[in-house]
Amino acid sequence: MAIERTLSIIKPDAVAKNVIGQIYARFEAAGLKIVAAKMVHLSRGEAEQFYAVHKERPFFKDLVDFMVSGPVMIQALEGENAIAKNRDLMGATDPKKAEKGTIRADFADSIDANAVHGSDAAETAAVEVAFFFPGMNVYSR
């Protein structure tokens, strides 16, 4: 099995609900290590740049507005099959369709306020981790 890194964002809705610790406990219980983390309030420019892949989609403006509405917790996770493990923990994008016991089923309110973001592939994970943690501030352990 390959050791991978993936990016995870706990979105403003979940930060406001004070469930960061509960989400972190799920990462750790699944064997994922938090190798970098920071709380930030994204600027509009940062959110637009991070989600640029969705720029032409009808939901882009609402997504950016939501992501700048409050602080977010950003972390790089590391472990065997980290990308797939994190996506399994998150559950379906729409919390109404997410399996019971997933982060979105337990903490998300809607398809827009869906608690968490996670990289979807190795290539995007590398880009996303580098976007928020450039240089030497990711620490394997």
Swiss-Prot record:
Its EC number is 2.7.4.6. PROSITE patterns: NDPK_LIKE. It comes from the Bacteria. It is found in: Cytoplasm. Belongs to the NDK family. Homotetramer. This is Nucleoside diphosphate kinase. The gene is ndk.
